[in-house]
Structure formats: structure tokens, C-alpha cells
A protein has these predicted regions:
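A short beta-strand-turn-helix
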Residues: 28-48
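Loop/turn elements at helix/coil->beta-strand transitions in domains of secreted/extracellular proteins
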Residues: 44-48, 79-84, 106-107, 113-117
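Bacterial Sec-dependent N-terminal signal peptides
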Residues: 1-28
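Oxidative protein folding and maturation machinery
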Residues: 152-454
Length: 454
């Protein structure tokens, strides 16, 4: 419940509150095995929604719960899908990820056809029911794509023709699936003359292969760096962002899988360079990449050291007044950009992430150290996170963040300030109750504070 994820917020309604109703929620069924789930899906000729709850981010799960609470949504999923809700460490999820060759999956929505083929992967949660309606429509359309199924059957039978591999690469990239192995198999079949074509260069770029991958080495070996950069810049901005995001995701996964610190430093530099016109964003995302890496590989010593540096010298070093000015300037620029565009428009307020990260890392210190000096620093970060939220959130009713208060209360308790911790936690609970949101996790924390077991 302590980890806060920054979500995309509409300019017209930055903080949307949806009242949850269990009667209106998508109906989730329990299954003892993958075989049982697919058997029912095939019998009813329906696709499958596997909604995966985060192990660490309780608020992310609450957000999904709200998003899946809508009458129209319930009806659509009941008619077209078998839906099941699983936790990150459930055996059913392990069966599914093994079947579809997913290395890992933390949270979000997986859509399968009734044969067990992955047709859509969403790596986030949202409180917007409309988003889940859009996912359903997309999954239904993709489930009718018999072309991909036919290609996969031929691949499983041992075929490795150029035509088959290029078809699989193109189809799987549409559903954000890892195409690294397929691309390398395809490149192995090409002559040097074929590799040196712009078509091959485009194919490699569009797949967003990880840094240090053989495919990237190939393209930079046969083309000058300037040629590759020029080709990349020829794509529309939206496509370039997608390609960079693929590179970042695939490289991060590779670095974590092999605990490769050299690779993560290269990724940190790569991410910083994508924000070369904005030093603040370059510094923020570059440092966050390192901190997240050491957390994921469970290197506590390096994690705490990098997190402390990130907080002290970047996040905490900027005053509230400065953040307010920069946030206002950014927001005005976004409004100006909105005036030049047609249709819907959304953006993620960058400077709010300072508060989110301070909160998240303060709580990580609560979990990983008993050093009173470090905990005292974490308490300051936690307090600053609440101040940032209050200063930058435009909606008066959302300025107080109960989840940040929850972190603050936990740290107060650990530092021996039990009465103040109880008072803070009670205030956080009152805010959640006034908004009609779930209070279960915060009530559990309050109980542990009172009985001295937190």
C-alpha cells in the first residue's frame, strides 16, 4: 500500500474518484489449474482475462478494482471473457507465464484466447473503466487473428523460413511480445547483402532490441552511427517513444535477469540521453533506473546507498517553491501544446514524481534498515513527500495523500514516536473513509502500531 505509481491524468480531471461497488465489478472465477481455466474458456468459446495483482503495490490493486467496477464493463466481460484474479506468486500465473514464455509479470492484465495464446498484455492498472473496455475490444479483435495462430503452429512444428519468422516478428510485436529470439533467428538466415538493406535496419530498430543485444550490434556494424541515428529520427515522435520504451524495458529485464550492473549503467546513460534537453528529467530517470535495479536484484547495500544519494542530492535538494514554479511552467506548456492538438489529451505531471519517489524510498528504508540515523532521514523524506503533494496537486480534496501519511506513521513508530504515529494513521484512515476507498491495509497497520508488532 505504500508504493505509489504515477499515472496519466486528464487535464480536465487530474484525480478521478470512482466509488467502488462489488455488484458492478467484473466477475472473477477461481481455477485450480491452467487446464481447468482453458477447458471452460474453450467450452464457452470465450477469451480469458487474467487480472494480476501486484505483490508490493496495494494502491495499484485498489486502482484496478475501481477501474473494473462498471456495469457496462461487467456485462461485456461476462459475455466475451472468462475472468480470473490472481496474485503475483500464484501457481496459476506461473503456469500461464511458462506457457506463453513470459520471463516475469508483475501486475496488470493478460488476455489469452481459449487455446492459451497470449493476445494482449497490459503492464499497468487504471481507475478508468473506459480503458478496460478498450482492452476488451482490442483483445476480441486480436483473438480473431487466425494468422498468428497458424504461424505459431508452423513454428512449433520446426519451420524456420524467412517468411515465417518475419511474419511472427511482425505479429508478436503488435502485442508487445519479446521478439529477440525470432529476430536473431531471422538474421542468421540473411546474407550480408540482405542485412545491409534499409528494410533490415528498420526491422531491427522497430523491435527495440536491448542494449548489447546481437541485433543492435549487427545494425551498428553495417551502418555508420550517423546513418542509424538519422533513420531513427525519420520516424514520428510517437513511434520513437515506443521504440525507446521497448529498448528500456528489454534491457532492464536482461540486466535484472543476469544481475548485470554494467548493463544497467549503460541503460541509465541511455535513458538520460533520451531526456538530453531536460537535465532534471535526465537526472531523475537515470538515477531511478539504478535504484530500481538494485532493489529488484535484492542487493540491499547498493540499493540503500543509491537510494539515499538519490533522495538527498536530487529529490530533497529542490525546494517546494522551486517545484511549484517548475510545475506551473510545465503545466502551462502542456496547455499550450493542447491548444495545437485535436482530440483527447493527457499528461503525467513530472514534478509530482518527486513526492512519489521520496515516499516510496522512505518506506523501503523502513523495511530494510533499523539504523536510527537513516530512519530519521527517511522520516524527513516522507514529510517532504506530503508537502510536495499538498503544494502541487490542484484538487483541494486530494492534497492530503493518505498513503504518504501511512508511510510517515510507520517511520514515526519505528523511531519510537508511537502516539504521533497513531494520530497520523487515524487521520489517513479518515481521509480514505471520506473518499469511499478501501481502508483494510491501513487499518491493519494501525492495529500493528497499537499492539507494537509493526
Amino acid at each position: 500500500m505504500k508504493k505509489i505509481f504515477t499515472t496519466f491524468l486528464s487535464l480536465s480531471s487530474l484525480f478521478l474518484l470512482l466509488v467502488f461497488s462489488t455488484n458492478a465489478q467484473v466477475k472473477f472465477e477461481e481455477f485450480s489449474s491452467l487446464e481447468a481455466m482453458l477447458s471452460k474458456a474453450k467450452k464457452e468459446h470465450k477469451s480469458v482475462l487474467v487480472q494480476v495483482e501486484s505483490k508490493e503495490c496495494g494502491q495499484c490493486n485498489d486502482v484496478a478494482q475501481k477501474g473494473l467496477s462498471d456495469t457496462a464493463l461487467k456485462e461485456k466481460y461476462a459475455v466475451n471473457f472468462i475472468s480470473t484474479l490472481v496474485k503475483q506468486d500464484d501457481n496459476l500465473l506461473k503456469e500461464i507465464t511458462n506457457m506463453v514464455n513470459l520471463k516475469s509479470y508483475e501486475m496488470g492484465s493478460l488476455f489469452l484466447d481459449y487455446d492459451g495464446n497470449l493476445i494482449l498484455k497490459i503492464n499497468s492498472t487504471t481507475s478508468r473503466p473506459m480503458a478496460y473496455l478498450e482492452y476488451a475490444d482490442k483483445a476480441m479483435a486480436l483473438s480473431k487473428n487466425t494468422g498468428l495462430k497458424d504461424l505459431e503452429v508452423r513454428y512449433k512444428q520446426g519451420e524456420r523460413s524467412k517468411e515465417l519468422l518475419i511474419g511472427l516478428i511482425q505479429e508478436k510485436s503488435k502485442i508487445d511480445f519479446d521478439t529477440r529470439l525470432l529476430l536473431e533467428q531471422y538474421l542468421d538466415l540473411l546474407t550480408l547483402k540482405e542485412i545491409r538493406t534499409m528494410e533490415t535496419a528498420k526491422l531491427i530498430l522497430e523491435q527495440g532490441m536491448p542494449l548489447e543485444s546481437r541485433a543492435r550490434e549487427v545494425i551498428y556494424a553495417v551502418f555508420p552511427d550517423s546513418k542509424v541515428d538519422s533513420l531513427f529520427l525519420s520516424y514520428p515522435l510517437e513511434d520513437r517513444i515506443k521504440m525507446n520504451n521497448k529498448i528500456i524495458t528489454s534491457t532492464r529485464q536482461a540486466a535484472v535477469r543476469f544481475k548485470n550492473s554494467n548493463l544497467i549503467y549503460k541503460l541509465s546513460n541511455f535513458i538520460s540521453n533520451t531526456h538530453q534537453k531536460n537535465f532534471e528529467k535526465a537526472n531523475f530517470h537515470g538515477q531511478k533506473t539504478l535504484v530500481d535495479f538494485y532493489k529488484e536484484i535484492k542487493d540491499t547495500t547498493n540499493f540503500l546507498q543509491n537510494a539515499e544519494n538519490f533522495c538527498n542530492y536530487s529529490l530533497f535538494a529542490v525546494s517546494i517553491d522551486t517545484l511549484k514554479k517548475r510545475n506551473g511552467r510545465e503545466r502551462n506548456e502542456m496547455f499550450e501544446q493542447r491548444g495545437k492538438l485535436s482530440g483527447s489529451f493527457s499528461y503525467s505531471p513530472f514534478y509530482l514524481q518527486y513526492g512519489s519517489e521520496l515516499n516510496n524510498l522512505a518506506y523501503e528504508f523502513f523495511k530494510h534498515t533499523n539504523d536510527l540515523e537513516k530512519l530519521a532521514k527517511a522520516l524527513k523524506w516522507s514529510k517532504r513527500s506530503m508537502e510536495i503533494n499538498e503544494a502541487l496537486v490542484p484538487d483541494e480534496s486530494r492534497k492530503q495523500n493518505p498513503y504518504f501519511m501511512d508511510t510517515y506513521a510507520s517511520l514515526l513508530y519505528r523511531l519510537g514516536k508511537k502516539d504521533e504515529a497513531i494520530e497520523t494513521q487515524i487521520k489517513a484512515l479518515e481521509i480514505l473513509k471520506s473518499r469511499g476507498e478501501s481502508t483494510t491495509n491501513l487499518e491493519t497497520t494501525l492495529s500493528k502500531i497499537k499492539n507494537g508488532s509493526l
